Amino acid sequence: MTTAVTQATIDGFFDASNGDPFATLGMHETEQGIEIRTLLPDANRMVVIERESGKEITELDCVDERGFFVGVIPNCRQFFAYQLQVFWGNEAQIIEDPYRFHPMIDDLEQWLLSEGSMLRPYEVLGAHFMECDGVSGVNFRLWAPNARRVSIVGDFNYWDGRRHPMRFHPKSGVWELFLPKASLGQLYKFELIDCYGNLRLKADPYAFSSQLRPDTASQISALPNVVEMTEQRRQANQANQPISIYEVHLGSWRRNLENNFWLDYDQIADELIPYVKEMGFTHIEFLPLSEFPFDGSWGYQPLGLYSPTSRFGSPEAFRRLVKRAHEAGINVILDWVPGHFPSDTHGLVAFDGTALYEHEDPREGYHQDWNTLIYNYGRNEVKNFLSSNALYWLERFGVDGIRMDAVASMIYRDYSRAEGEWIPNQYGGRENLEAIEFLKHTNWKIHSEMAGAISIAEESTSFAGVTHPSEDGGLGFNFKWNMGWMNDTLAYMKLDPIYRQYHHNKMTFGMVYQYSENFVLPLSHDEVVHGKYSLLGKMPGDTWQKFANLRAYYGYMWGYPGKKLLFMGNEFAQGREWNYEESLDWFLLDENIGGGWHKGVLKLVKDLNQIYQKNRPLFELDNSPEGFDWLVVDDAANSVFAFERRSSNGERIIVVSNFTPVPRHNYRIGVNVAGKYEEILNTDSMYYEGSNVGNFGCVASEKIESHGRENSISVSIPPLATVYLRLKAK
């Protein structure tokens, strides 16, 4: 036996306790010459071959029958490139020895990782194809600073943790191993001995591809190439442009009729993209597509943040879906969940035995609403892991924006917690200062590295400055969901029209704070699940009134300042709640089944999108008081509202809504500019299955004072309807 290696050291490899394999394995200088030591459980013989010439150098001695081999090359003083001829019974193969290769992570990379200032840590950590000393392979790296030992296991080594223990870099807490001949598509995990001596089998947090549940392995996959931002996509994201978002859950938008199984990314591209284009939406927003273990979470409890879910195909197929959207002139937004993660054992929980990604104290680290764990945003490596993930989706898949989920739960330490269930910040306050800094940092990274991409916050409180620049003390988002507007207006619409007069302010209150943030008006998936009923189901009255109410509400929403978001199925007034396990009720568009009602709503949404895109007053000055003026704000008795939308070049559209089933004929509205106003939309049109009350295409102003204005128009406002009147150019 070699005197340089003790039996205890050898035993450490086989009981998986040796955390420094490169100190023993590979080439080492000794007094007698270069000594080569290898670990290959179950091998019978081992011969060293000079790589360049193919010449046999020496046969190694088996010093431990479990598979530890040693041999000295006498008088050899220089390291050289070699291969190993391994004999397994009667079979032999020539392999590269992973332990002859030098470290590939440099000091600067380690420093940047530890500082949390590496812009793209996914280019360093995880599994990456590369070449070392002329040998192709995959370099695996994992951050697990408190583990005693880490091995890479997978299809390439029979999932045997003894075979490929990794090199530890104490400066950064990163483990590394270059594995020659590892190939695309092979499955792998990291086997850790944690700080307490427990064995843990973990998926790669930076994996670019992962198995479909219930399997949990990572898959070797190439880092996708960068997708450059185009001027067309950048322009479509601007605050002065029309943004109408179709929110989609890919697993239930449409399914295979034969087996109710999911469509794949390519099938979705074939069917969804033309539909969205035809309907006039400018953006698609996908519910989260990072790999997640539980279907019922809809993607909002992800574990494989860098892996597009394999439910619908490969990462390459998802890139094709995004590309197809861009070719159709549609931008793509992705729901993104940096607020919490599930406690599945193969994931991030207690990763190296310590609370590495989460907080140790459940008052900070446990989310009781969702039974999930909360990220430790104060840890550099965790903050960087998350913020760079947003950039990854934008750069590597061409996604045009992210919608950040549950921001309120991140920025408040007492979110959904009773007294005594949370820990104040260092100043005694309730704000999560580390999370706030993380949000600012993430938005800075997005906007500095991917100019033109947008970030949208789902933030349900009145936290100030969500869409203000970070240099002005804001969080730096481009847009914020207007949850207040959504809750108020839906509460109003649920009321029987006879009672709406007593809640008139619910439809007007949003303008009090309209210019405090840049808003998106969201009718999202959250409003059509968990016993809340569908949007149609929320509307009062008989069938005619339900559909009329919904059409009037949509008209009001598309006329109101703010970008638009509509969850799938609402564009044709699906009657039942959304079910993530089934396709939407497309059969309702069959007039023999739906009676034409649903098709009428579909036509309306399509027309609303077209009118919205073609008329600058409806979108250009959403965030400026110059773009809006109440004309009728106080007619609670009749539940009538009228306001004017304006563009920067003087174009004007008047939006008039009547939320009672009583038509209002000869209703006088004061106008700011005298002239003729053409009716460009009427939600009561027979084309939408309405009663067809209207204004015969046009109304002219008269010099009759009304609502404090010298001129006015007399209009017929249909029952439960919204009308758009556009000032005709002179």
Swiss-Prot record:
* EC number of the protein: 2.4.1.18
CDD domains reported in the protein's UniProt record: AmyAc_Glg_BE, E_set_GBE_prok_N
Task: Give the multimer and partner information.
Answer: Monomer.
Q: What is the lineage of its organism?
A: Bacteria, Pseudomonadati, Pseudomonadota, Gammaproteobacteria, Pasteurellales
Q: Cross-referenced NCBIfam families, in alphabetical order?
A: branching_enzym (TIGR01515), PRK05402.1 (NF003811), PRK12313.1 (NF008967)
- Broad EC category: transferase
**What is a GO molecular function of this protein?**
hydrolase activity, hydrolyzing O-glycosyl compounds
Out of the domains of life, which is the source?
Bacteria
Question: According to its UniProt record, which reaction does this protein catalyse?
Answer: Transfers a segment of a (1->4)-alpha-D-glucan chain to a primary hydroxy group in a similar glucan chain
Q: Tell me which SMART domains the record gives.
A: Aamy
- Name the job this protein performs: Catalyzes the formation of the alpha-1,6-glucosidic linkages in glycogen by scission of a 1,4-alpha-linked oligosaccharide from growing alpha-1,4-glucan chains and the subsequent attachment of the oligosaccharide to the alpha-1,6 position.
Q: In which pathway does it act?
A: Glycan biosynthesis; glycogen biosynthesis
**Family per similarity comment:** Belongs to the glycosyl hydrolase 13 family. GlgB subfamily.
Q: Which Pfam families match?
A: Alpha-amylase (PF00128), Alpha-amylase_C (PF02806), CBM_48 (PF02922), GlgB_N (PF22019)
Q: How is this protein named in the record? A: 1,4-alpha-glucan branching enzyme GlgB
PANTHER family according to UniProt: 1,4-ALPHA-GLUCAN-BRANCHING ENZYME
Give an example GO cellular component term for this record. Answer: cytosol
User: What SUPFAM superfamilies does the database record attribute to this sequence?
Assistant: (Trans)glycosidases (SSF51445), E set domains (SSF81296), Glycosyl hydrolase domain (SSF51011)
Q: Name one GO biological process term.
A: glycogen biosynthetic process
Q: Which of UniProt's keywords are assigned here?
A: Carbohydrate metabolism, Glycogen biosynthesis, Glycogen metabolism, Glycosyltransferase, Transferase
Spell out the catalytic residues. Answer: D405 (nucleophile), E458 (proton donor)
